[in-house]
């Protein structure tokens, strides 16, 4: 089984049917995007926009969002936004029941026969790789060791693919001048909102407490990703203990795993994270194309489950 996920071979659609009215508190829109990240979308719509979930960049996706504001519809090649109505209820993460997926795959004749036998199998409900920023692993390692100075420095200076030219300059300055807090805070390229952190460090070099002065949204996203990693690690240990092969799960697993936030995470508003340990695909079917050994596979997964994990399970099970 072979596949290459991109906007022409990977399609995702939220299965969500909100009850809409003519006049309500929130405006509801359908967003269709191709090859665009969630961060790219956020630059085009109001900041108060709410989603059921974040959709993959390497796909063509259809999803709902709501906002209190009126916005113009968009009809571009890789982005469409269409007004659908209003509601007094807002959208939240996980409000929809399922996501449907269509993926272009290649199968040989023996794999084709085996594939349908797998559709009823239970699959380990891991978070997919796209859930994790490349910096998560290192930051988690430093935090676990209690190396808060190194963790703070890494958080403030580690490069990201989303960095602007100005962000790159700021990170470079902080890295080069680390410890010279007064000099950093006086730099013209440091935004006023960031200077509070360096004023604090100038008076009190408590690196753990200093995290209270970093950009909260970015830190919270990082800590949530760390919680997801802890879930994956816990699930992997349970799967090994139950002699699960690869991603194939068993009902012998506890139905859910609860990840309790650390005292550090609680300071930034993180709560307990509860997630099911396995899932089963629904509505599985194959459709032939006009090319030999090429098929469209269609399936639906519960909210929060990753198609990339399911595809990986199918591929490894066919080996």
Descriptions of predicted regions:
Residues 1-302, 308-319:
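Extended, charged/glycine-rich binding lobes that contact polyanionic ligands
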